[in-house]
């Protein structure tokens, strides 16, 4: 399976109408592969470009007993197979600079987690791979304060950049979305993604894990498209209530086609307004 070069992939993402979708974590290979094929089918039916997302290690879980993932070696093996068999590019995150190079051997997009968006060494290491880099805006960071993250990546020689809005802390155990962040961050000359599922998360809201209000995912995603976002990030799962990570805010896989068709229709309206 031939995949786009980093430059070609970034150009396609800059052309808008795309999704980054998949389970929160690689909890099971068969579940991940099933999800990847379903994401591709739903995206194609809606006329959207798709990238498969999932994490090989969830290093920022609430509890020491929380499921984290299969680890680097097995995780890269799984993602390589999913990438080849589904035909989708893949995005996954790193947490330490030394993880950038091995992850870049498989991933088309390297993602910087929200809590690590200011870590200079991590950003520079991701940039040095030459891959597209998606930096998630921290819940504690103002949209205009993401400009330095972009400047760090560019200073390291990488212009293939995405920024992702995923909500801002709003008191305790809650997030709120300020849609002004979309045009603000687009003003840095990069495509902007909206994370519709983490934005409905209730961080630590279940005590030993995070809660979520997935019923709000569609309205937040539609609002982001109406606000001019370039792409939408969606965690989805065949059975969210049994997911080992972020189930409360994950979108049911069987409801993904309808949601993507709604988003596609809204993106199409931009051309007639």
Curated annotation (Swiss-Prot):
Gene name tied to this protein: kdsA
Keyword Hydrolase: no
Pfam families: DAHP_synth_1
InterPro entries xref list: Aldolase_TIM, DAHP1/KDSA, KDO8P_synthase
Highest taxon listed in the record's lineage: Bacteria
UniProt record similarity statement: Belongs to the KdsA family.
Gene3D superfamilies the UniProt entry points to: Aldolase class I (3.20.20.70)
Name listed for the protein in its UniProt record: 2-dehydro-3-deoxyphosphooctonate aldolase
Keyword Nuclease attached: no
Catalysed reactions listed for this entry: D-arabinose 5-phosphate + phosphoenolpyruvate + H2O = 3-deoxy-alpha-D-manno-2-octulosonate-8-phosphate + phosphate
EC number from the UniProt entry: 2.5.1.55
Alphabetical GO biological process terms: keto-3-deoxy-D-manno-octulosonic acid biosynthetic process
Compartments (UniProt record): Cytoplasm
Cellular component, GO, one term: cytoplasm
Molecular function (Gene Ontology), one example: 3-deoxy-8-phosphooctulonate synthase activity
Pathway(s) where this gene product acts: Carbohydrate biosynthesis; 3-deoxy-D-manno-octulosonate biosynthesis; 3-deoxy-D-manno-octulosonate from D-ribulose 5-phosphate: step 2/3; Bacterial outer membrane biogenesis; lipopolysaccharide biosynthesis
